[in-house]
Amino acid sequence: MKCTAREWLRVTTVLFMARAIPAMVVPNATLLEKLLEKYMDEDGEWWIAKQRGKRAITDNDMQSILDLHNKLRSQVYPTASNMEYMTWDVELERSAESWAESCLWEHGPASLLPSIGQNLGAHWGRYRPPTFHVQSWYDEVKDFSYPYEHECNPYCPFRCSGPVCTHYTQVVWATSNRIGCAINLCHNMNIWGQIWPKAVYLVCNYSPKGNWWGHAPYKHGRPCSACPPSFGGGCRENLCYKEGSDRYYPPREEETNEIERQQSQVHDTHVRTRSDDSSRNEVISAQQMSQIVSCEVRLRDQCKGTTCNRYECPAGCLDSKAKVIGSVHYEMQSSICRAAIHYGIIDNDGGWVDITRQGRKHYFIKSNRNGIQTIGKYQSANSFTVSKVTVQAVTCETTVEQLCPFHKPASHCPRVYCPRNCMQANPHYARVIGTRVYSDLSSICRAAVHAGVVRNHGGYVDVMPVDKRKTYIASFQNGIFSESLQNPPGGKAFRVFAVV
């Protein structure tokens, strides 16, 4: 007997055992038919996909996926002491949408996998809500044995008695507090050698990434007893919770349908590759903190009402006639570079100088040092001091809070040398919080890669500590997902700049 596509149900999840997938007879497939009919024209042909103004997931599906994740995370056993409330992230949604459009039954793209977690699900035949797959991921718990603290010496064992448990562990990974998903309709999708004519493909991306080898998915203990300080002691239904975090949703230009139409291949002459995905959110910044100045430039000329920290002086300033007023504290009409030579920060070969504005001084003392005679002045005026620019090599985990936190009126950080491959660093220990302006809890080097001031092969970075911000915005740039943060207690901020 011949069975049509409507009469069969196929349901699977990535990383199940690679074997033939059982089929079940479905007597009624009208729900899926109605859903798919919205994508056909009068002749029964599939529409060509429109420009991307819509999203590949509805508000209802978004909310149901999010609610189910938080419900499942709140009821883990043994109980979790540090399980964080999960929120929706539009950048993760966009990356999930991009991968869902590829219709490839594998994790990807490879450029993102070091920094995100990912669960996949697919079915065809009878309609299934996306929460069907979320629940199936969680149901792997029956095969998972939680590693208690006394078993972790120092690494925790991973015990899974079934085909796979990593979907479950990603769903309940305590620090994975952001999720974004997308749904796509894939024609003739290859699922482990079987061709599914109309596969409904669900991709969910998570950040920070879970499933780190040697770690338990969460800490066992009384709920909310080990929440990170950034949550301020907030707890909601056994989850670490910060007031207001559940009320933010990204703005939608237009409501979308449940299944995204696959783009026609007829009009697309460009073959997309994995490298296309890695460069979609590429950001490059050549903005420098260090300003190149001449021997004659005075701080008063170069710095009016802006934050001026670091200058690059040319060689030969000993021969300049530009005046310098004061000693130790220099008057604002002094030459920046000649004041630096006078104080001994640089020599006649030039170099970098850090400047700190010091407010008004009642007088300035003349002196002769390092071949430069300064002028005395017994009149109140604004002043500045000079200091040496040091260079320090750091790790991918080093933060501004550790190295050079902001202190009023200003702080100077050494010029930082970042190592290679910070994109692949563990985002739990090398967080990136913010966009353009970053929380000082962030990894300096991963923030620099995110901002585009240095590539993944490492290099020099200038860091400017600044006062705290009320809001840090999440984004996906250069292969790194940054976190959002609202009203952090106490912490300061920083910016990163290129060294050219």
Swiss-Prot record:
Disulfide bonds join 295-313, 317-337, 396-418, 422-445. Residues 66-206 form the SCP domain. The keyword Signal applies. The lineage of its organism: Eukaryota, Metazoa, Chordata, Craniata, Vertebrata. Residues 254-281 are annotated as: Disordered. Pfam families: CAP, LCCL. Residues 289-384, 390-492 form the LCCL domain. It comes from Homo sapiens. Belongs to the CRISP family. Gene3D superfamilies: CAP, LCCL-like domain. Its main location: secreted. The keyword Cell cycle does not apply. It is found in: Secreted. One of its GO terms (biological process) is hematopoietic stem cell homeostasis. Residues 254-280 have a biased composition (Basic and acidic residues). This is Cysteine-rich secretory protein LCCL domain-containing 1. Residues 1-23 form the signal peptide.
